[in-house]
Amino acid sequence: IVRADLNELRAKILELGRDNILCVLSTTSCFAPRARDDVETIATICKEANIGHVINNAYGLIDSKCCHAVNQACRVGRVDAFVQSTDKNLMVPVGGAIVAGPNKKFITRIGENYPGRASMSPILDLFITLLSLGKDGWKQKLKERARNVPVLVESLRQVAEKYGKRVLETSKGNNISIAVTCDGVEDPTELGSWLFKRSVS
């Protein structure tokens, strides 16, 4: 499994010095075979070094393990902000993000940096979607996703085996995406274009 090297992070902080580092950017949600970073330990390192820490939680709202990791990071160390995508998590069109964090003043200051010029569409789309789903509807969607992920993995495994490929085992550190080997494919970019033409993303 591929993830951030914590020893390298510590060494780089010592090499550069905290005054030369704006922040550390970690991630909970990424494409397999990369796994979720150990955001709890990174938060502890950032707290000890007094360096800002931003978590890319792009897909994380739909995965309870990612949410738990972010909550723990906020509790045990330093997290200045975490950012989530509305389209990836909340079934709305592309273009919106939720910036949150444990320090309300800091998040308010972020919001004040771009007053009045952003489009209202992402906020309105999100508001309408959440109102129509309601709390119970949202929880039901999360349960459906949790039930469907193992089914998708098993179905992909069967298709992969049929064509002499395999699904990479990344579920211990990545519940967001699934990777299939493409060894033997002469031009992987051509495979990407085939998938794109068939609306597979």
Language model features by range: what are they?
Residues 1-158:
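Conserved PLP-enzyme active-site core in the AAT-like
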Residues 79, 151-201:
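Conserved C-terminal alpha-helix-loop-beta "cap" of PLP-dependent enzymes
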